[in-house]
Amino acid sequence: MPAVSAHSLGQCKKPGASGFVSLRATSFYFALIAGVCLLLADIEVISPNPWLELKAMGQGLVSPRMVSYAELLNGLANTLSFALQGMAVAVVAGFALALLYRHWWVRSFCAFIRAIHELFWALIFIQCFGLSPLTGLLAIALPYAGTLAKIYGELFEETPAQPRRALQEARSLSAFCYTSLALAWPALCHYTRYRFECALRSTVILGFIGLPTLGFYLETALSEGHYSEAAGLLYVLLLLIASQRWWLRKSLLPVYLLVALVCLPPSANVNWQTLTQFFTQDIIPQPLRANSGNSFGPWLAFLWQQQLWPGVLNTLVLSQIALFFTALLALLAMPFNAPLFVGPWVQRASTGLLLVARTLPEYLLAFVALLLWGPSMLPAIVALALHNSAIIAQLLAGFSESLKLRDDACKGVNRYAYEILPRIYRQFLALLFYRWEVIMRESAILGILGIATLGFYIDSAFEEFRFDRAALLILASALLNMAVDILARTLRRRLHIVTTVDTR
């Protein structure tokens, strides 16, 4: 919704309908699509006694118990080492790619590598390097390099051109360093810090497929019903991420990275014959390997009917439902985190809850919910909506704090509905569309937990050593994600959606 005029501020009048048409229509269609998807979704509660399991989890949360200190320190060290090394490689590669981001082929390459989830990359590299440090490093570095290249490239493009023109006689590299890079540096550092937090969460999730991070011990404790130990590890994870502002210092980063390289060298026992066979034979469709081109059509048709189409459909269904409930929860949670609506104590409590929800990865939340309700789309919907709505609600609350209100502005629900929401609705949609791509990626990967999205069929293909099927399904997942990214950018452009707020 567009910003209300200065005359209407404080009057609690509904803005004119003409300014709302396109945004209302977009919101309505997304809600309608989510409603249709709900009719197709499997949201059955399969667990025979979820309340008993919930009670056991609650008891574990209030009586945390640590695993052995050796396991805890090992998990922490590996988690930090994977994140630091992966981000170091991603920053260097992302920066180099950002310098060439104006070229379409660079943008396409970056879009492709970031469209593949880090867990899918890990499953690929496990076949090549086993459960080694190199697998974890590459699984983090590749998709994050694509993401950082995009953001860095856009930051460089958005810097004012006047300073660069003023240095026409300077060398190109010098001009870039003293203009574009210098102007973009604060935002670049801020975003890199945020991505490191994301890398910590991703590294934890790599433990769920066997790498020795905190997630490995957390998955073991949850699977065996040791909820007190799981709670202890959960609190360590929350403390690790929440305390970043104190221990993540620029001056200490070289020291951290050096220690990470010593503790966990990025090595692997590489069998070059196996590696060559994987990329030159194993991922090639079986009919083509057998020089049987006539059977390629039936092979592809079978894969489409049995795995590709059901996987794509369920991924789309899950992501659209999760997107809708993300929007709904974000709009409901935002007022409880904004000083325009609540007192300081309520705001602090709300901030704490949102911090927990956005700190815990969707995969972990879905895993816990799956233990309660069984393998349906319901755990995934709840996990995706909780995590992403917490991120959006926190940002919307920050936007609302910059708004100026008249002394006679209305209060309560009217203030929210007619004063604040119309002025931040464009920003809300912008954030929602940014998260759409993330939700799509996560919807695919949650199939590893038993939900019939693309991740379910990809994981099954790896377990059956059908790497050709896995490669094609991963390619489909990447293309689906790239299509959603293009659609989201198109909608943002056509609706003139921005992330700056009218503070008048």
Task: Set out the residue ranges of the language-model regions.
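Cytoplasmic-entry segments and transmembrane alpha-helices of multi-pass inner-membrane transporters
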Residues: 93-124, 151-155, 332-368, 394, ...
